[in-house]
Amino acid sequence: MYGSIVKFPPSGGAIWYDKNRKVPDTVTGAPPAELLAKPTVKVQAHLGYSTEAQAEIQGAEWYRFGFSPHTLIMTGSDTCMCYGSGFDVDPYGRVFFPNMGQFRVEVVDTANNPITMFGKYGNQDSGGKDAAVKKPDIPMAWPLSVAASDTHVYVADDINRRVLKVRMNHAAEESCEVK
C-alpha cells in the first residue's frame, strides 16, 4: 500500500532491484560510469511477488517513504491492483503527496524536510459551512492524487467522489528592504 518518492538530481540516478545490477532488456546501452560511481542506499522493496526483496537507490538526493496508495505490480498473479496515485511539485519545489492510510496530504521541501500536513478522516457529509457534519475542516476518505499551484492544492478523494480545493496560507509573513 505504501511506496516511496525518490528525488534524483538532473544528472540522474537508478533504482536497482537485481543484486547483480543487471540492466533490463528495455534499456539500450550500459549505465554511464558517473552514475555507477554515485553512492547507494539499500532499502527493502516490494516487487509484487516478494516482500523480502532488496533494492538499491543510487545517486538520489533523498527519498521519502509514505506515498500512498502505491500501485503494486502483481507478477504472476491475477490480483488486480487498479489504483494509481499522483503527487505534485509546486513552483517552489515543494512536494505534495497523498498518505491514504492517514487520510491526509503531506508536504516536504526541496531537501525532504517536512513542512506540514493537512486532512483528517471524513465522509461526504463532513466539512464546510453547509455540511451536515462540520468537522473536520478538510475531510478525506481516500486521497488519491494531489495537484498543487502557487496558491491552492487540489486533492482527488475517490471514496467521497469529490475534488477538494485547499487554499494555502502562511502563518507568518515578513518583508525586508533589498539593498
State the predicted function of each range.
Residues 1-179:
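Eukaryotic scaffold repeat domains enriched in small/polar residues
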